[in-house]
UniProtKB/Swiss-Prot annotation:
Main localisation: nucleus
Region (Necessary for homooligomerization): 78-219
GO CC aspect terms: cytoplasm; nuclear speck
One Pfam family cited in the UniProt record for this chain: RRM_1
Record-given protein name: Polyadenylate-binding protein 2
Keyword Coiled coil: yes
Comment field on protein domains: The RRM domain is essential for the recognition of specific adenine bases in the poly(A) tail, but not sufficient for poly(A) binding.
Keyword Calcium part of the UniProt annotation: no
Region (Disordered): 1-24
Motif position, Nuclear localization signal: 165-172
CDD domains to which the protein is assigned, alphabetical: RRM_II_PABPs (cd12306)
Lineage, uppermost ranks: Eukaryota, Viridiplantae, Streptophyta, Embryophyta, Tracheophyta
One term of GO molecular function: mRNA binding
Bilayer-crossing regions: none
Length: 220
């Protein structure tokens, strides 16, 4: 049997690693092009993030400027001047409560015109335009306030008015309102209140002999 001969041209067949090395050696520009693409993409991402940060910072600055404008940022001297002016107006004004809903500013002005020169009458209303039942009367003279206080419990439209000196509201400061005098709560007893009618387990109207009387009664 004859042996078959196989001819190998060019020597031994190179392995896969050697072939890859040869391909890289033959195409050195492939890796450089891929690296350039990655660098370009990374640079674009950095530019995009930087643009987003700049837009966010600009939006924050715009929002801050808008808030400062709405809050009416003023210097302390201007705020103090406005507060002083408000206190001066309040010193010439009175609060009028229990005003009839059908009462007009002209009628309120006529009711207080004997006290002094009425500069302004303001009847407060709700969001629907309905009167709330109280008003503010501003006079030209400070002395008119004391005269107006004398009209407390005077009647207008058959209703007793409640006339008080107007308070000045200080911004950012909650004012303390003292409790009104109540003749039924002016004095508080230290002893707890006991009902005159108490349930007794010994029967109606009976109490154990070892108990002391609940209340002292000097007159029998």
């Amino acid at each position: 049997m004859e042996e078959e001969e196989h001819e190998v041209y060019g020597g031994e067949i190179p392995d896969v690693g050697e072939m890859d090395g040869d391909m890289e050696a033959l195409n050195p520009d492939l890796d450089m092009a891929a690296a350039d693409d990655d660098a370009v993409k990374e640079l674009d991402e950095m530019k995009k993030r930087l643009k987003e940060m700049e837009d966010e910072a600009a939006a924050l600055r715009e929002m801050q400027a808008k808030v400062e404008k709405e809050m009416g940022a003023q210097d302390p001297a201007s705020i103090a001047a406005n507060q002083a002016g408000k206190e001066e107006v309040d010193a010439r004004s009175v609060f009028v409560g229990n005003v009839d809903y059908a009462c007009t500013p002209e009628e309120v002005q006529q009711h207080f015109q004997t006290c002094g020169t009425v500069h302004r009458v303001t009847i407060l209303t709700d969001k629907f335009g309905q009167p709330k039942g109280f008003a503010y009367v501003e006079f030209v003279e400070v002395e008119a306030v004391q005269e107006a206080l004398q009209l407390n419990e005077s009647e207008l439209h058959g209703r007793q008015l409640k006339v008080l000196q107007k308070r000045t509201n200080v911004p950012g400061l909650k004012q303390f309102r003292g409790r009104r005098f109540n003749p039924y709560m002016g004095y508080r007893f230290r002893r707890p209140f006991m009902s005159p009618y108490m349930y007794s387990p010994y029967g109606y109207g009976k109490a154990p002999r070892f108990r002391r009387p609940m209340r002292y009664m000097p007159y029998q």
